[in-house]
Amino acid sequence: MPLSALRIFALLCLALRMTAAEPLPDIPDPLGRAGMMAAVLKDTDGQEVILAAGGCNFPGKMPWDGGTKVFYADIFLLKKTAGKWAWRLVGQLPTPSAYAAFAATPARDGLVIAGGCNADGHLSAVLVVKADGKCLPLEAKLAEPRAYAGCFTLGSRLIVSGGTSQPTATAALATMTVLDLAKPADGWKSTDDKEDFARILPLVGADENGAVLWAGGCALSDDQGKPLRDYRDALTYSKPSGQGTKFHALPTPLAASAGPGVAAGHHLFFVGGDDGKHYGKPPATHPGQSTQVIAIDTETLEVQVVDQWPHPVATAPLLRLGDDLVTISGETRPGVRTPACTRWTIPAKLR
């Protein structure tokens, strides 16, 4: 029986949807990891590869059942050989870590990792990880330990925004700090304190014209000696030299989206995140993090939901591989990770 035109159309739509978010191989940990650091590098043969490191998960019990968070030092390389993508373990970080600032080096020959945290506390070390797994420490340490910050690059500069300096902090750091990766010996330069920067897990990025955006995240306050999160929707956009700053808002509060924001034309893309609607409720009943793919137009500040990711995701690296967005593992709901590495093609009209 011939297919009806409607069924043919439906099958075509399904095929397009499936190719729009083609999964890459899972990371070599079936539990998955949150808070990994990753970058797209150029291999010695000119091919784009993905280097990913660190992260954390709960290999035993869930946290609400008394489980312990375990941090990792693994360095994984994802490379396409004979038409097939495959991960392999290439080395170990000097210390297990997660939730660090990260970026590719200006030459795209290494992954820069700054700060982060592990079971012993927050970190201030900065290192460059090569595709062969070698780790080269930089003398330019952060002025203080910093984890759960936003991070992005602007030219050769790595910019780190907000975060905390210790696990029990009841206030977020209120500075952006900058390291020129082309001149790391010059050290970090920090802004004055600014309330807009005092967030953990903010959405941050820079577009292709050098304009900087920071949005969402969580402010922290003291609740009987423990940090209390306040999810924010503020969106601030600063144009290059002297062109002013605009203030706007996200449609809803949002933190911990896969990031940093990926620039394509005059859009910045983010994936998933935590809207805070279930904060303070029993984590075992959490329905899952966001699946939204959002595009922020840096000319109009319009925020569009342009698609749905195949699975919930938060606290994951967001990378650009060719014309695709890629998430590397991440959290699907509190305490639960996914090993999936998923890709989605940026629509031509948004590039």
Question: Where are these predicted regions, by residue range?
Answer:
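N-terminal secretory signal peptides that target proteins for export/translocation
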Residues: M1-A5
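Bacterial N-terminal signal peptides
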Residues: R7-R17
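Kelch-like beta-propeller repeat domains
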Residues: A20-R351
